Regions:
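N-terminal glycine-rich FAD/FM-binding segment characteristic of electron-transfer flavoproteins
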Residues: 1-303
Length: 303
């Protein structure tokens, strides 16, 4: 039986649960924050552990708590979203469990009882299939990789587990610098490339994203130029997204970038170069000065 445990202590990853439900031939188990059991059940979890915790605090202490929980449940495949905090916690668990861990996967499949984990390698020049030889197989999955799909209705087994952090170590606050929804959850993304040309240009794109109720994205070259922070990067070395609408502004359309937004519903490209590869991928294209187009959209009252 391929029983899979998905660790989502900081928020349900609907896409990852959907994929795990399809992979599992046994019961899909999930650890989720208090109050999110119903959502986890909708996306395939049959046995749900709601985490009651006033705060998580020190990650090493929380990892020790999760370690005992995993051992008690006995799952042989453990998955988690590759968020900032789970990227720290999963290696601690893998070391204690003497398990193989593949980080930042972009695809998963089963061959018998073996989990095949796919991730970019050698500077994103190829995709590597990885098999873990350990008894417990572990992987983190890039957020937004899998499209959320609701599963057949079922009545889940829900249990509450309580975590009390060491009172000697307290997390005073945990803030997010992100504007709007995280990219992996955004339904509308306005993304810019090197063609935008400056931080000031990206401020205009961010204003448009806010007007549309979306989030700001960027190509790797724009991030490396210092126009926007890494959290905005879409692509093989950034975040994989699947919004309903993706507006690509001044983005040429490199393969690495396209791989990160291939799950988008509709793609609108704005570029002054009519031969830009992004137009081959877009549903709608506008050839012209991006700033003039964006200025008109910002002035449009009916958006």
């Amino acid at each position: 039986m391929k029983e899979i445990l998905v660790l989502c202590p900081f928020g349900v990853d609907k896409g990852l649960l959907s994929k795990a439900a399809r992979l599992s031939s046994g019961e899909l188990r999930a650890l989720v924050p208090a109050g999110e059991a119903e959502t986890a059940a909708e996306y395939g979890a049959g046995r749900i552990f709601e985490l009651s915790a006033p705060e998580i605090g020190d990650e090493s202490a929380f990892a020790a708590f999760l370690l005992e929980t995993i051992r008690r449940w006995g799952s042989r495949i453990v998955l988690a979203p590759a968020t900032v905090r789970m990227r720290n916690i999963m290696p601690m668990l893998a070391w204690q469990l003497d398990a193989g861990l593949t980080a930042d996967c972009t695809a998963l499949r089963m061959e018998g009882e073996q989990l095949i984990q796919t991730r970019p390698a050698f500077g994103n020049s190829l995709m590597a299939d990885i098999r873990s030889l350990s008894e417990i197989q572990m992987a983190t999955v890039r957020p937004g990789t899998f499209r959320p799909e609701k599963q057949a209705a079922k009545t889940p087994d829900v249990q509450t587990i309580t975590y009390t952090p060491d009172e000697r170590v307290k997390l005073r606050s945990f803030g997010s610098f992100a504007q709007g929804k995280p990219l992996s959850q955004a339904e509308i993304i306005v993304a810019g490339g090197m063609g935008v040309g400056s931080k000031a240009g990206f401020e205009k794109l961010e204003a448009l994203a806010k007007k549309l109720g979306g989030s700001l994205g960027a190509s790797r070259t724009a991030v490396e130029a210092g126009f926007v922070p890494y959290r905005c990067q879409v692509g093989m070395t950034g975040i994989t997204v699947c919004p309903k609408l993706y507006i690509a502004v001044g983005i040429s359309g490199a393969v690495q970038h396209l791989a990160g937004m291939s799950g988008s519903g509709k793609v609108v490209a704005i570029n002054s170069d009519p031969k830009a590869p992004i137009f081959d991928y877009a549903d709608y294209g506008i050839v012209g000065d991006w700033e003039a187009v964006v200025d008109k959209l910002l002035k449009e009252e009916n958006l």
